[in-house]
Amino acid sequence: MHKLNENDVTPEHIFFERRKIIQSMGLMGAASLLPRFSLAAEKQDSRQALHFAKDHNPQNLLLTPENKVIGYNNFYEFGVDKASPAKYASALKTEPWTLRIEGEVEKPMTFDVHQLMQQLPLEERIYRFRCVEAWSMVIPWIGFELNKLLALVQPTSQAKYVEFETLYEPDSMPGQKNHFFGGGLIYPYVEGLTMAEAMHPLTLLSVGLYGKTLAPQNGAPIRLVVPWKYGFKNIKSIVKITLKSEQPMTTWHHAAPHEYGFYANVNPEVDHPRWSQASERVIGSGGLLSVKRQPTLLFNGYAEQVAHLYQDLDLRTYF
């Protein structure tokens, strides 16, 4: 079996550009500073089967092989290398897990995520996934629409934005404990949507993929999936949701506002400052020689469903 490495699925100029930046920050070799987080931390697959309504895939999208979906990840809390999350994330304890929703709501509530999975009917959604680094997958997520959960807390008329926050637990997330290992980001990881985006029926809170609960490296036990936005908006391992009247400051926008906008909609006409977004490398079943490129679609192919959300916005200014 071909062992996937970062150069297999990231365009060469992006691969070396990112390596250069990481080296300049002293991040290469940072794993050696973390002996407690052993590379032997990988465990056998402990994901559980889920009951859900099947997506019959009317668009006939070709699914990315499961081993690549769970083996090639961005989750800086477990390191900046694509293989690091699968190596280190097994230290994350995902049960019990609570999700707090507060802010501009009539009924602030704390949910047990595993009870929530029984309370709200689960469905499969086969979505395109586009990383800002210009690679893509097709993933069969399992979850429920975010709007169904928000309806339970009754948002007020002042709720204009939704802020999401990842677990902050440095003892199990080495990237939070070591500044270099975690890519120099400020934690906990924070993301946000407009209220209209959050209430859109395509916006999913995922608790599984490929018929089973999420692996820790994929954001277990609950993560956001917004298929028309770049992957960094799809925040993982969520512990808190806050409805706000003002736009929240999000992690990557804070780190590099000229490179990572708040909206982060997939747009082939708006390049990243350091690489083109006009096309993407498709992660498939083969190795380096079989990887293909394809044109990137506006809103990742979901323009018909979501373009109206941005009809009054200049997509170059509000990227």
Curated annotation (Swiss-Prot):
<dbReference type="InterPro" id="IPR036374">
    <property type="entry name" value="OxRdtase_Mopterin-bd_sf"/>
</dbReference>
<feature type="signal peptide" description="Tat-type signal">
    <location>
        <begin position="1"/>
        <end position="40"/>
    </location>
</feature>
<keyword id="KW-0732">Signal</keyword>
<dbReference type="InterPro" id="IPR022867">
    <property type="entry name" value="MsrP"/>
</dbReference>
<dbReference type="GO" id="GO:0030091">
    <property type="term" value="P:protein repair"/>
</dbReference>
<keyword id="KW-0500">Molybdenum</keyword>
<feature type="binding site">
    <location>
        <position position="131"/>
    </location>
    <ligand>
        <name>Mo-molybdopterin</name>
    </ligand>
</feature>
<keyword id="KW-0574">Periplasm</keyword>
<comment type="subunit">
    <text>Heterodimer of a catalytic subunit (MsrP) and a heme-binding subunit (MsrQ).</text>
</comment>
<protein>
    <recommendedName>
        <fullName>Protein-methionine-sulfoxide reductase catalytic subunit MsrP</fullName>
        <ecNumber>1.8.5.-</ecNumber>
    </recommendedName>
</protein>
<keyword id="KW-0479">Metal-binding</keyword>
<dbReference type="Pfam" id="PF00174">
    <property type="entry name" value="Oxidored_molyb"/>
</dbReference>
<comment type="function">
    <text>Part of the MsrPQ system that repairs oxidized periplasmic proteins containing methionine sulfoxide residues (Met-O), using respiratory chain electrons. Thus protects these proteins from oxidative-stress damage caused by reactive species of oxygen and chlorine generated by the host defense mechanisms. MsrPQ is essential for the maintenance of envelope integrity under bleach stress, rescuing a wide series of structurally unrelated periplasmic proteins from methionine oxidation.</text>
</comment>
<keyword id="KW-0560">Oxidoreductase</keyword>
<feature type="binding site">
    <location>
        <position position="223"/>
    </location>
    <ligand>
        <name>Mo-molybdopterin</name>
    </ligand>
</feature>
<dbReference type="GO" id="GO:0042597">
    <property type="term" value="C:periplasmic space"/>
</dbReference>
<comment type="similarity">
    <text>Belongs to the MsrP family.</text>
</comment>
<feature type="binding site">
    <location>
        <position position="73"/>
    </location>
    <ligand>
        <name>Mo-molybdopterin</name>
    </ligand>
</feature>
<feature type="binding site">
    <location>
        <position position="218"/>
    </location>
    <ligand>
        <name>Mo-molybdopterin</name>
    </ligand>
</feature>
<dbReference type="GO" id="GO:0046872">
    <property type="term" value="F:metal ion binding"/>
</dbReference>
<feature type="binding site">
    <location>
        <begin position="234"/>
        <end position="236"/>
    </location>
    <ligand>
        <name>Mo-molybdopterin</name>
    </ligand>
</feature>
<feature type="binding site">
    <location>
        <position position="166"/>
    </location>
    <ligand>
        <name>Mo-molybdopterin</name>
    </ligand>
</feature>
<dbReference type="GO" id="GO:0016672">
    <property type="term" value="F:oxidoreductase activity, acting on a sulfur group of donors, quinone or similar compound as acceptor"/>
</dbReference>
<feature type="binding site">
    <location>
        <begin position="76"/>
        <end position="77"/>
    </location>
    <ligand>
        <name>Mo-molybdopterin</name>
    </ligand>
</feature>
<dbReference type="InterPro" id="IPR000572">
    <property type="entry name" value="OxRdtase_Mopterin-bd_dom"/>
</dbReference>
<dbReference type="GO" id="GO:0043546">
    <property type="term" value="F:molybdopterin cofactor binding"/>
</dbReference>
